[in-house]
C-alpha cells in the first residue's frame, strides 16, 4: 500500500477507525497475506522496500545506481517470508544482484559472472566456471527462457563450455527437474554427449580418472594443486549420470546403458582412488599417484552429485572443526591445520584458505543431499545446515565508509573477519576496473533456500516431496510463494498455529492456489501434481523473449 492509499482511509467516516487500523497494519506488516481467493499468498508490494534500499545502498557505495526494475522482480521472483530478516534480506539482495547479470544479446539471454568485461571471459563476457550455479538459480524464475536460452548458449558456436570445469549435463538435468520440460533436455542430448566425449579426449587418463589444473577449476593457488581433483571427477560422474537419465527419457536405451556404465566406473574410482582412508576425506591426487595429503573444501563436492557411500559421511566432522574448515563468515577452502594454510602469495585470488562463496554453495548443496538420504547419518543435521547457511548469509555484507553494514557480494573473503580480500587488494593497487567484484555472480543462494532449507526436492515425476531442514522450534512460520515448478506455481507454507497465513496449522503445499499436500507438523510432506501446464504469465514471458 502506498502512502496516498493509506491517507484515503484517514478521511473515511463511520467505519474510518477500522479502515485506519487496517491501513496501518498493512503498512507495517512485512509479509502481509492476500485474501484466500487469490492464487498469490503474499503481497509483493510488502517486499518492495528491500529493493528500494538496495538501490539506495548501491548509489551510496558506487556513486550511482541502475533504475529499479521492479516489474522484473514481480514477474519472475519467488517470494519469501521468514522470521529471520537477515536471511530474507540476502535472499532478495541476491535476486537484485542476479538480475543485473541477465543480459539480452543477439544470441539470446546469457548470464555473466562479472558486470565489467574481463579478459579471461569468453564471448558475451561469459565464463563457464559458475554456469552450473547460474542455471540452478535461474531455473526458479518465472520466465523459463532465461535459463533455457543461457543453457543453449553454451552449446552454440559462441559457447566455450570446456574453458573451465563445468557440470553441464547435470545442470541441464537439474533444469528439467524444475521445469518439467523434458523435450528441452532431450534436444540437447547430442551436444551433451559430444561435450562429454571431448572431456574424455583431453582430460581423462588411461587409469580412468580426470585431471584438471586448479586454475581451470576456477580455484587457483590451491594447496592440493592440479591433478585428479574431486571436483572434475565428480562433475564428470554427474554428467554421465545425467546423460544416462536424459537418454532414458529419449528412449535411447543403448546410450543410457553406456553412460550409466561410465558413471558407475568413475564412481568406483572416486571412492577408491580419491578417498584418503587415513584422513577420512576425498583429496586431490597428483597425476603421478601421490596424494596431496590435505583436506580441502572441494572434498565435499562428491556429495553434490551423490557419489559417496554412507560410511564416508565421517568427512563432515571437519566442517565445523576449529582446525578443519570452521569460519565465522563461511568455511575455509583448506583445513586450518595444514602447514600451508594461507601460504603467502601476492595474487588476490587464492584458494589456500580464504572463504569462497562458489565453494560454500557447492558445500551447502552437498550437505542438503546428505541430509536428504533416507538413512542419513547422524553426523550432520538440519541444525548444521542452518548454521552453515547463516555463516554464508552473514558473509554477504560490507561496511560503508560511514559505518553502515549493507548487503554485498564480492570475490573471496577472510573467514574470520568477513573482509573482502580481493576487493581490498585491488583497491590498494588502484587496479582497474574499479569495484571489479561488485555483485560477483559466482555462487548461488535462492536455490539453497528453496531446495535445501525449505526442502523442495525436485523430481522427474509429478510426485512432490517437501522435506524442510529448518530445525524444529527454530521458526514459527515460513512461506515461499509463486515458485514455478513443472508448469505450476507452488506455495509452500509452514504456520505453527495457523494464525499467520490462515491456511491451517502445519506444513501446507499449494499448487496454483489449491491445497495438494498437508502435514500437521514441520515434517516431510508429499503431494502429487496434476498434469503439467504452463501458467499464463510464463507463456506470455516466453513469447515476449522470442
Regions found by a protein language model. Give the residues of each.
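Well-ordered alpha-helical scaffold segments within catalytic/enzyme domains
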Residues: 73-85, 132-142, 168-184, 234-253, ...
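Non-catalytic carbohydrate-binding regions of carbohydrate-active enzymes
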Residues: 168, 250-284, 314-489
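The feature captures the catalytic groove of carbohydrate-active enzymes
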Residues: 38-61, 68, 158-166, 197-262, ...
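N-terminal Sec-pathway targeting helices
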Residues: 1-17
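Aromatic/His-enriched, Gly/Pro-containing loop or helix-boundary segments
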Residues: 153-162, 174-178
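Acidic/polar, glycine-enriched structural segments that form the non-catalytic walls/loops
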Residues: 23-122, 177, 182-184, 189, ...
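Extended glycan-interaction surfaces of carbohydrate-active proteins
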Residues: 85-124, 137-157, 197-228, 268-355, ...
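Beta-rich accessory regions
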Residues: 13-14, 21-31, 258-261, 265-267, ...
Amino acid at each position: 500500500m502506498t502512502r496516498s492509499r493509506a491517507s484515503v482511509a484517514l478521511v473515511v467516516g463511520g467505519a474510518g477507525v477500522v479502515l485506519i487500523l487496517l491501513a496501518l497494519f498493512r503498512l507495517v506488516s512485512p509479509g502481509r497475506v492476500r485474501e484466500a481467493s487469490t492464487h498469490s499468498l503474499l503481497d509483493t508490494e510488502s517486499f518492495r522496500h528491500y529493493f528500494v534500499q538496495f538501490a539506495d545502498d548501491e548509489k551510496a557505495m558506487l556513486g550511482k545506481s541502475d533504475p529499479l526494475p521492479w516489474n522484473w522482480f514481480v514477474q519472475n521472483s519467488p517470494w519469501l517470508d521468514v522470521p529471520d530478516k537477515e536471511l530474507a534480506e540476502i535472499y532478495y539482495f541476491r535476486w537484485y544482484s542476479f538480475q543485473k547479470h541477465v543480459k539480452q544479446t543477439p544470441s539470446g539471454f546469457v548470464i555473466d559472472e562479472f558486470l565489467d568485461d574481463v579478459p579471461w571471459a569468453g564471448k558475451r563476457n561469459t565464463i563457464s566456471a559458475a554456469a552450473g550455479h547460474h542455471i540452478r538459480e535461474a531455473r526458479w524464475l518465472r520466465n523459463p527462457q532465461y535459463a533455457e536460452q543461457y543453457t543453449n548458449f553454451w552449446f552454440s558456436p559462441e559457447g566455450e563450455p570446456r574453458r573451465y570445469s563445468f557440470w553441464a549435463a547435470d545442470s541441464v538435468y537439474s533444469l528439467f527437474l524444475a521445469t518439467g520440460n523434458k523435450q528441452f533436455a532431450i534436444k540437447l542430448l547430442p551436444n551433451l554427449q559430444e561435450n562429454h566425449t571431448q572431456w574424455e579426449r583431453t582430460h581423462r587418463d588411461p587409469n580412468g580418472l580426470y585431471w584438471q589444473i586448479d586454475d581451470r577449476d576456477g580455484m587457483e593457488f590451491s594447496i592440493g594443486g592440479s591433478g585428479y581433483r574431486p571436483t572434475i571427477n565428480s562433475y564428470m560422474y554427474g554428467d554421465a549420470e545425467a546423460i544416462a537419465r536424459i537418454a532414458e527419457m529419449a528412449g535411447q536405451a543403448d546410450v543410457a546403458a553406456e553412460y550409466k556404465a561410465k558413471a558407475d566406473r568413475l564412481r568406483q574410482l572416486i571412492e577408491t582412488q580419491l578417498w584418503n582412508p587415513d584422513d577420512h576425506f576425498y583429496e586431490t591426487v597428483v597425476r603421478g599417484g601421490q596424494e596431496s595429503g590435505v583436506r580441502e573444501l572441494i572434498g565435499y563436492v562428491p556429495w553434490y552429485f551423490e557419489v559417496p557411500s554412507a560410511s564416508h559421511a565421517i568427512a563432515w566432522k571437519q566442517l565445523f572443526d576449529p582446525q578443519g574448515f570452521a569460519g565465522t563468515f563461511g568455511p575455509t577452502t583448506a583445513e586450518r591445520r595444514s602447514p600451508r594454510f594461507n601460504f603467502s602469495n601476492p595474487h588476490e585470488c587464492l584458494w589456500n584458505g580464504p572463504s569462497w562463496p562458489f565453494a560454500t554453495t557447492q558445500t551447502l548443496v552437498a550437505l542438503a543431499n546428505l541430509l536428504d538420504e533416507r538413512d542419513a547419518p547422524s553426523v550432520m543435521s538440519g541444525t548444521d545446515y542452518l548454521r552453515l547457511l547463516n555463516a554464508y548469509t552473514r558473509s554477504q555484507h560490507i561496511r560503508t565508509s560511514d559505518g553502515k553494514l549493507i548487503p554485498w557480494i564480492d570475490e573471496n573473503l577472510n573467514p574470520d573477519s568477513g573482509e573482502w580480500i580481493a576487493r581490498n587488494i585491488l583497491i590498494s593497487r588502484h587496479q582497474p576496473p574499479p569495484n571489479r567484484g561488485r555483485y560477483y555472480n559466482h555462487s548461488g543462494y535462492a536455490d539453497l533456500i528453496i531446495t535445501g532449507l525449505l526442502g523442495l526436492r525436485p523430481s522427474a515425476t509429478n510426485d512432490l516431496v517437501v522435506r524442510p531442514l529448518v530445525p524444529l522450534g527454530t521458526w514459527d512460520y515460513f512461506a515461499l510463494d509463486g515458485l514455478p515448478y513443472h508448469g505450476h506455481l507452488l506455495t509452500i507454507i509452514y504456520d505453527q498455529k495457523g494464525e499467520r497465513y490462515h491456511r491451517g496449522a502445519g506444513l501446507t503445499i499449494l499448487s496454483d492456489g489449491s491445497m495438494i499436500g498437508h502435514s500437521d507438523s514441520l515434517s516431510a510432506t508429499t503431494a502429487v501434481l496434476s498434469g503439467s501446464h504452463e501458467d499464463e504469465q510464463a507463456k506470455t514471458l516466453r513469447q515476449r523473449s522470442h
